UniProtKB/Swiss-Prot annotation:
EC number: 3.4.23.36
Pfam family, one: Peptidase_A8
Compartments where found: Cell inner membrane
The protein's annotated pathway: Protein modification; lipoprotein biosynthesis (signal peptide cleavage)
Keyword Cell membrane: yes
High-level lineage: Bacteria, Pseudomonadati, Pseudomonadota, Alphaproteobacteria, Hyphomicrobiales
Organism: Brucella canis (strain ATCC 23365 / NCTC 10854 / RM-666)
Gene symbol of the encoding locus: lspA
Protein name, as recorded: Lipoprotein signal peptidase
Listed GO MF terms: aspartic-type endopeptidase activity
């Protein structure tokens, strides 16, 4: 992989981790557990903890199992990132966001035994699961990877 691709991806990973951990620090230090601060009619900060992974799944694995799974996922995504062609920019930054988000949540799990969640989308009769910025980075990263795959498929289809 080209040097520029490595450094720019590393920058995205570090920035994602720093932003995620900075916000989580503010939430943990300035909000009590279960506190909700409404920002917009449909958006609030709501401090909670997730002892599993997405949507509290696999909480029964406890810290050791969840840390092992997270490390395996990070290693796999690093492999995909490293073997990705540098000109596949959406995928490169997508992998970087997935890695940054996974590291952000891994830091929480190692330090606290849970992941700090705080973003709540809600309506008067409905609410979405509470999540954090690391989760959003992972989701956006996955979306960029899928976009890159779609664009590659489309380019290949047009060229034939």
């Amino acid at each position: 992989m080209k040097r520029h691709a490595v450094w720019s991806s590393l920058f995205v990973v570090i920035l994602a981790v720093l932003i995620d951990q900075g916000i989580k620090y503010l939430v943990e230090s300035r909000m009590f557990y279960g506190q909700q601060i409404d920002l917009l009619p449909f958006l609030a900060l709501f401090r909670t903890h997730n002892e599993g992974i997405a949507f509290s799944m696999l909480a029964w694995l406890h810290d050791g199992g969840l840390i092992a799974i997270t490390l395996a996922v990070i290693a796999f995504v690093l492999y995909l990132w490293w073997t990705n062609a540098p000109e596949r920019v959406f995928a490169r930054y997508g992998f970087a966001l997935v890695i940054g988000g996974a590291i952000g949540n891994l830091i929480d799990r190692v330090m606290h035994g849970y992941v700090v969640d705080y973003v709540l989308f809600h309506l008067p009769t409905w609410s979405f699961a509470v999540f954090n910025l690391a989760d959003a980075f992972i989701t956006i990263g996955a979306g960029l990877i899928i976009l890159e795959e779609f664009l590659g498929w489309r380019r290949e289809r047009i060229s034939h």
